[in-house]
Amino acid sequence: MDEQKHHEELIKGISEQMKSVLGKSEQAIYIYLDDNHKVCNKKFADLLGYKSPKEWADADAPLSDVVEEDQQSVINAYTNASEKMVASDIEVRVKNVETDKIVKTRMIIAPVGHAGHVFTVHFFSKI
């Protein structure tokens, strides 16, 4: 199995594993393996103005929804989670692609293991 297919299977597997969390949480959530392999719940897609979770997952630039000044903080938190296994809690401003409105959020990012790989899970709450 090539890497692309393997990563597709991994994201499908963790989506199933986390299905109840994604569906029942009051928070906007996304799970990230890499730029091409990610999944979110409907609340996250709605927060950013996407028509569906699939539309967000198909977007190529994962940081394009984050205000430029906050992007480095998100990158640092991701690095801590994916490489050091350290969770972070940071303030992040995101942009709704439909309205261009800036939304202030608190993001909790934590590492999660699945099938021998480290994913990052991002929980967002408006502030």
Feature-to-residue mapping (PLM):
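Short loop/turn elements at sensory-signaling interfaces that couple input to output
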Residues: 1, 106-126
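PAS and related sensory helical modules
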Residues: 38, 45-64, 71-72
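PAS-family sensory domains
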Residues: 93-100
